[in-house]
Amino acid sequence: YETDAQGKETMLTVKEKKIAAEIEKEEIQEEELAGEAIAENTKELPKPVKKSLYMILLSIFFWFAAYNAVTTAFSRYAVKVWGLEGGGFADCLMVATVAAIFSYIPIGMISEKFGRKKCIQGGLLLLLISYLSAAFFPVYHPAINIGFILIGIGWASISVNSLPMIVEICSLGDVGKYTGVYYTFSMAAQIFTPIFSGFLMQHISYRVLFPYACVFTILAMITMCMVKHGDSKPQAKKKVWEHFDVED
């Protein structure tokens, strides 16, 4: 009830059936739009896009095979080849890790300007130069740490941009599936490479380690050149700390 200025009470009524019908109509329209969006986003990828997806997945396998071989076998390599004792090898790995941490934000900014693919290719080039340089050191020298700084920067360039490229290539409805494929290839490489590289070092020489990493890095560079999709430049961040956001 509502009371007017003269003190009279008036009964207010609500057209419930009309409102209910409008609500039901809106819900049906929303469901139809959602269905159309799902159908659009779960369409099969075109062949050229699929090829790019397969090539970047192979690249992921190759660069993880190279990088993981170095990180898992470096302690033994440093002792057997360079004669480092007392855990001195840990300093090199620490240098690479710190370099990567300090590189993430600048690399995000570089990706905004030049694109993800070029940033990944630059990272692979840094890794190749570093692995190749390390292979020519007969004994440990402090200059080796420069190579490990480049390894950290190169690996950061790859890790910042690779998963976003997968997400960019796949359709919205398949993001979860292709993210799973990304981790399948990366983990498969990390299972394969310690076994295979370990076998080669045991039966040939520990000096095989860095040439081994070079070969797989070159393979990653070749397959990455065949990736033609997923290279849109990420949107520029308004704040510096937004570069820490993870896109998956």
Show the residue positions of the predicted features.
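Loop-to-transmembrane helix entry/capping segments in MFS-fold secondary transporters
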Residues: G86-G87, C170-Y182
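Intracellular juxtamembrane helix-capping segments at the cytosolic ends
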Residues: S157-S171
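Hydrophobic core of transmembrane alpha-helices in multi-pass small-molecule transporters
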Residues: A143-S157
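Juxtamembrane intracellular "pre-TM" segments in multi-pass secondary transporters
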Residues: Y1-L57, K239-D248
